[in-house]
């Protein structure tokens, strides 16, 4: 997933780790997913050159990341029906493609019913209104979140993505996308699968 103003990041990704997809190594495909903004015309022009941008019909804001994530899942189930695995990541993340292929091969069976990445088993809602991750009692009355994988990047099977899309029709909207996906995972009886190869910057 990307933000409209992050063209330099998209170009850097295209010129670095996405080169593997251009050389068809590992049969990997990608798209950048974005919402509507004042830059929609520029994004359409960028896509005319790159043919790798999908625009959703929602405002591209932080509080709409759940819409963006679910759009990406819905798009994958419709346009990637022959895919075995799907990875969701952000435009400020570096993906080591050979490492990703190894991780998928080593965890292929587990990922048939799980989402893998840098996962927390439990976390508490932040009630401070000044926080980027603020959650009101009205939007989330429980004391703890279900376990979740960091939205910076996770991998799973198309089978799991399909199940999440279906169950999302019965899960009320929540603005923190990684928590929302976790709610769908929990309701579906799916699992989290921590993978050591997924590292956040503050993990070092």
Task: Label every model-predicted segment.
Residues 1-204:
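Secretory-pathway lumenal glyco-enzymes, predominantly type II signal-anchor Golgi glycosyltransferases
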């Amino acid at each position: 997933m990307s933000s409209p103003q992050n063209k330099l990041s998209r170009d850097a990704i295209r010129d670095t780790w996405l080169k593997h997809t251009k050389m068809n190594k590992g049969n990997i495909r990608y798209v950048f997913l974005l919402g509507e903004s004042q830059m929609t015309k520029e994004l359409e022009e960028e896509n005319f050159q790159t043919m790798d941008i999908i625009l959703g019909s929602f405002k591209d804001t932080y509080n709409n990341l759940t819409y963006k994530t679910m759009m990406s899942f819905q798009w994958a189930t419709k346009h990637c029906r022959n895919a075995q695995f799907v990875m969701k990541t952000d435009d400020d993340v570096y993906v080591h493609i050979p490492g990703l292929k190894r991780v998928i091969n080593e965890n292929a069976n587990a990922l048939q019913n799980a989402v893998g990445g840098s996962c927390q088993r439990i976390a508490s809602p932040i009630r401070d209104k000044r926080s980027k991750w603020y959650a009101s009692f009205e939007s989330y009355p429980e004391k703890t979140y279900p376990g979740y994988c960091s939205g910076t990047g996770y991998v799973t099977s198309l089978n799991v993505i399909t199940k999440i899309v279906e169950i999302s029709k019965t899960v009320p909207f929540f603005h923190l996308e990684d928590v929302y996906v976790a709610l769908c995972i929990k309701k579906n009886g799916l699992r989290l699968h921590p993978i050591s190869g997924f590292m956040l910057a503050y993990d070092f």
